[in-house]
Amino acid sequence: MISDIEFAFSECNFQFAYKDLQKINLYIKRILLLNTRFNLISNSNSNFNSILNLHVIDSLLGLPTIKEINPSEILDVGSGSGFPGIVLAIFDTSRKYYLLERSKKKSTFLKMIKLELDLENVKILEYEIEREKKKYEFITIRAFRSMNEYALVLKNLLKNGGLIMAYKGKFDKINLEVNQIKDLFSKIEVKSLNSKLSLDRNLVLLYR
């Protein structure tokens, strides 16, 4: 299975160390093993290569933007089974990642993975987003919901000059969502995620 990860990463021109591939391999295997117990991903995607291509690769496509902005800490909202937070933390060990997940089941899984993969740069926050009081310079979210459902709540957690990086799908749908929230932010930028293994994906950067 590590050979599959190595091939996929090479196709996307990702830089990696073998120890990181081992962690990703173990992480995917744990999702497959515990999916039924913790309700981590949909059954239609519950095979190794689907998780690798649809979730791991997709999560990593945001890392160049993170390195470009270079925040010291990142809040990942609605981390679920750990996409993108766990994946980013594996390859970005110099930064602190706060993974916010309200579901007890999923946050329990995240705590298990944090320990097993020895991710010292990860902290799991198990509560509703409305309880979070800390301000962040960078927030990630990878959700199927429309941006207008969470834009204001997340904006209130941003430091001045901070930004939200939302993983999104088709560009035409993004335009509709952006028009609904454009007055909330000083600048909105859409970045196309070009990858052989990731179809029609974009990042939306919302600047406070």
From Swiss-Prot:
Residues binding S-adenosyl-L-methionine: 78, 83, 101-103, 129-130, 142
Similarity remark: Belongs to the methyltransferase superfamily. RNA methyltransferase RsmG family.
Entries under HAMAP family matching the protein: 16SrRNA_methyltr_G
NCBIfam families listed in its UniProt record: rsmG_gidB
Cellular component GO terms held in the UniProt record: cytosol
Entry EC number(s): 2.1.1.-
Range of residues in the leader sequence: none
Highest taxon of the lineage: Bacteria
Gene Ontology MF annotations: rRNA (guanine-N7-)-methyltransferase activity
SUPFAM superfamilies, sorted: S-adenosyl-L-methionine-dependent methyltransferases
Compartment(s) of residence: Cytoplasm
SS bond list: none
Protein name, as recorded: Ribosomal RNA small subunit methyltransferase G
Lineage: Bacteria, Pseudomonadati, Spirochaetota, Spirochaetia, Spirochaetales
